[in-house]
Amino acid sequence: MGAEALSNRTNWQMGARISGDAGERTFAAQVAPYLGAEYVVQHRPPKLKIYSEEKWIKLDTRITNTVTGLSLYIENKEGNNGGNAHERVYKFLSPALKRVVRETFNTVENPFFLVFSGRTFQGQKYKDEINLLCEGENYAIMTSDYENIQEVANQIMEIV
């Protein structure tokens, strides 16, 4: 594809970014009312500086239990047109990354909770992959209209 064709094609990444940002905000707003008064939900918490040379990871939401002082970080992947956005969350399954975040940022034992939302993740292929690769981890696949938000909030309160 030539330079002109490339510059004139649809920028699918921008659409995906808008959809992803909306999904992050939606989850934080949807879960907050179902958590107890002792929970603080922070959308776009500070970056976690864990690598050398001021490199960091950035998660979508932090939920803190003000009684225990412990936090849980949420990474939300919103998908509405297929694709592989969900594959980028698998780094959060790394035992070493979990250990560093837990030791540095006052979190629960498993500091990450992965959320998959949007039309894409209603498909059986995606559900099967996520259920297999995230087995034993903190995660939820949101139903199309967040009908399972109470269940997910309960799951989060059991963790943190």
Language model features with spans:
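Phosphate/oxyanion-binding active-site loops and adjacent basic polyanion-contact surfaces
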Residues: 19-27, 54, 84-89
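Hydrophobic beta-strand residues in large extracellular and virion-surface proteins
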Residues: 31, 41, 60-63, 74, ...
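Catalytic cores of nucleic-acid endonucleases
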Residues: 70-72, 76-135
